[in-house]
């Protein structure tokens, strides 16, 4: 990215959303205004325990969606019932920060979520008590970076938006201002 480019959602956060949050919660210090710290995209591939090629599809999908190479997550311990051995790859994870995070959130909110069939909004009950929000997507085809013809099987993913908010009320207000479509 060029050095003078700023993602549009980041610009909106700095110019409009920070002021709105400060007016509502009346912070004493501007550093108390909540912001988005990072976004973690996790794709669990339990079938990779039986077929090690399954993880490659998840890695390619996550790379296309986020623009960043995923980290392979391995099993911490062996579980005989799941035919799982310690060290086997069972998932992939990407942590987005900075401009890549703002670009991903912008694409998620404006392009990907509206493409979900029968989408009625995200639940606003999935906050963790500290202002962080986690939600799941059932398949990866809603992202336009994924070529639907090349998808071997639908894979879901978990997306966690980590904020610097101290409680759920502040986190909910921040994400609603950013454009998250809560029910």
Swiss-Prot record:
Alphabetical GO biological process terms: translation
Keyword hit for rRNA-binding: yes
Keyword rRNA-binding annotated: yes
GO cellular component: ribonucleoprotein complex; ribosome
Domain of life from the UniProt record: Bacteria
Keyword field: Ribonucleoprotein, Ribosomal protein, RNA-binding, rRNA-binding, tRNA-binding
GO molecular function annotation: rRNA binding; structural constituent of ribosome; tRNA binding
InterPro entries for the chain: Ribosomal_uL5 (IPR002132), Ribosomal_uL5_bac-type (IPR020930), Ribosomal_uL5_C (IPR031309), Ribosomal_uL5_dom_sf (IPR022803), Ribosomal_uL5_N (IPR031310)
Role this protein plays: This is one of the proteins that bind and probably mediate the attachment of the 5S RNA into the large ribosomal subunit, where it forms part of the central protuberance. In the 70S ribosome it contacts protein S13 of the 30S subunit (bridge B1b), connecting the 2 subunits; this bridge is implicated in subunit movement. Contacts the P site tRNA; the 5S rRNA and some of its associated proteins might help stabilize positioning of ribosome-bound tRNAs.
Subunit structure: Part of the 50S ribosomal subunit; part of the 5S rRNA/L5/L18/L25 subcomplex. Contacts the 5S rRNA and the P site tRNA. Forms a bridge to the 30S subunit in the 70S ribosome.
Family: Belongs to the universal ribosomal protein uL5 family.
HAMAP family for the chain: Ribosomal_uL5_B
Name the UniProt record assigns to this protein: Large ribosomal subunit protein uL5
Organism: Corynebacterium aurimucosum (strain ATCC 700975 / DSM 44827 / CIP 107346 / CN-1)
């Amino acid at each position: 990215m060029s050095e003078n480019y700023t993602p549009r959602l980041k610009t909106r956060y700095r110019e409009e959303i920070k002021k709105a949050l400060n007016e509502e919660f009346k912070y004493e210090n501007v550093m108390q205004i909540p912001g988005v710290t990072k976004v973690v995209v996790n794709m669990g591939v339990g079938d990779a325990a039986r077929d090690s090629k399954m993880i490659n599809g998840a890695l390619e999908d996550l790379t296309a969606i986020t623009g960043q190479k995923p980290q392979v997550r391995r099993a911490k311990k062996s579980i005989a019932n799941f035919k799982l051995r310690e060290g086997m790859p069972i998932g992939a994870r990407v942590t987005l920060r900075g401009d890549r995070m703002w670009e991903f959130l912008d694409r998620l909110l404006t392009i990907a979520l509206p493409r979900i069939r029968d989408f009625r909004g995200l639940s606003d009950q999935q906050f963790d008590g500290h202002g962080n929000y986690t939600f799941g997507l059932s398949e990866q085809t809603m992202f336009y970076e994924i070529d639907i013809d090349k998808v071997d099987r639908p894979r879901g993913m978990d997306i966690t938006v980590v904020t610097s908010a101290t409680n759920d009320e502040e986190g909910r207000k921040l994400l609603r201002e950013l454009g998250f479509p809560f029910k």
